[in-house]
């Protein structure tokens, strides 16, 4: 039986999942607790990201044939994550003035899901986090609850659903040829799965 040490636990912390959990907690709390947490969430997430190394991994075996890799950290993902963590901290500062609990919480869920997309090491985790980001961002647009925001969020979800379906078709084609791992993505340049 494998022992879970503190070092092993630190390499398994997924910044995106931490941010998503904070987002749902923020939606449940009263306003006095919501404001500090909306700033604390990106700071904790940035700290968790800075603890990661190239050996960080968060595997999950869905079945004997399907293994999901929620964390794949290379230099490109590290750069994008650093930029996105900075943006998330700035968004947390902006979020201090946001009054609506669901807008504040769903913006954290959206930020966490985009971090999940950046760190995805396989096709399934990529599409899961992609779809979470679609619905979270649609709700952030809809949070004003008036006719204009409802129409804008409907148009947004239609465009995002079309893009998500094209991504899904491309990933299915990619998985058929190369498997679930995203390491061979550069090998399919020029093929239909790459362009979808």
Predicted regions and their residues:
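Transmembrane helix-loop-helix hairpins at membrane boundaries of multipass inner-membrane proteins
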Residues: 1-105, 180, 184-186
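Alpha-helical multi-pass transmembrane bundles of energy-transducing inner-membrane proteins
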Residues: 105-109, 113-195
């Amino acid at each position: 039986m494998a022992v879970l040490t503190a070092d092993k636990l630190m390499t398994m912390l997924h910044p995106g999942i931490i941010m998503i959990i904070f987002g749902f907690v923020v939606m449940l709390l009263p306003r006095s607790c919501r404001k500090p947490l909306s700033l604390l969430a990106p700071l904790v997430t940035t700290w968790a990201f800075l603890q990661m190394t190239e050996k960080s991994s968060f595997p999950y075996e869905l079945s004997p044939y399907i293994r999901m890799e929620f964390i794949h950290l290379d230099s490109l993902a590290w750069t994008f994550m650093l930029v996105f963590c900075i943006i998330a901290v700035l968004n947390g500062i902006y979020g201090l003035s946001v009054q609506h609990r669901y807008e504040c919480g769903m913006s954290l869920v959206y930020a966490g899901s985009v971090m999940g997309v950046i760190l995805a090491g396989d096709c399934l985790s990529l599409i899961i986090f992609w779809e979470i980001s679609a619905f979270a961002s649609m709700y952030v647009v809809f949070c004003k609850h008036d006719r204009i925001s409802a129409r804008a969020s409907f148009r947004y979800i239609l465009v995002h659903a079309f893009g998500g379906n094209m991504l899904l078709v491309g990933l299915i084609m990619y998985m058929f040829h190369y498997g679930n791992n995203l390491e061979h993505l550069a090998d399919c340049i020029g093929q239909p799965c790459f362009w979808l």
